[in-house]
Amino acid sequence: MYISKLYREEDRGKILEFLKQNEFATLVACDGEKPTASHLLMEVMEDGEQLFVNGHMSKANPLWKTFEKNAEVLVIFQGAHTYISPTWYNHVNVPTWNYQAVHVYGSPRIISDHDETYNLLEKLIERHEAGSQYRLKTLPQDFVEKEMRGIVAFQIEVTRIEANYKLSQNRDDEDYHNVIARLNERDDEMSHGVAEAMKRQRSSHSRDVTGTM
C-alpha cells in the first residue's frame, strides 16, 4: 500500500503488539478472476524471527479454496480511526482522517492435520477464556469433532509487512496536543483510541514537522 515516509512504522515490536491487539482482520485473496475477502479472527504467532498468521473459517466459505491459486495473500489489520477537524489547528487547513493500518503478506497453506488443527483451536480458546474453566478438552469430544468437520484451519507464512500509522506526525506540539485533547472530548471509543495511539507515537518518536498532509 502507499505509505508516506512520515507515517511508515518499522519497529517490529510495536507492529507485533498492534497485530495482537487488533486480531479481527480481513483476509484478501483472488479466486482467479476477481478479489475475494473474509473478515476473520487472525492470530499472529512467532517462531524465532519468522512470523505466522493462524486462522480458521467455515468450510462453506469458498475463500479457502483459492489458496492453491494464490502464492501470496493479504491480511489487513485495522486499528482505531477517526475524523480530524481543521478547526483544531492554529492556522487554516483542511480536514483529514487519522488511522493505523497494517498489511501483512504471506504464503497460505491449509492445515489438514487433525492434531495441528485441534491444538490451534485449543490454544485460541485458552487465550480468550483465560478467566474461565471453558476448555476444548472438557467438552464432549464427539461434539468437538463434529464442529471441527465444519471448519478449515489455515496458516500464512509472513513474507512482508507494511505498517501505516497516520497520526498527525506532521503537526507541531501545540496542534498535536490540541488534536488529542479534542479527540478525548468526544464520546466515541474510536476517537479515544486514536488519541491514545497519538500519545504513544509522539512519546516514542522525535518530532518531525514537514507539512505533509
Regions found by a protein language model. Name each.
Residues N22-K59:
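Short beta-strand segments
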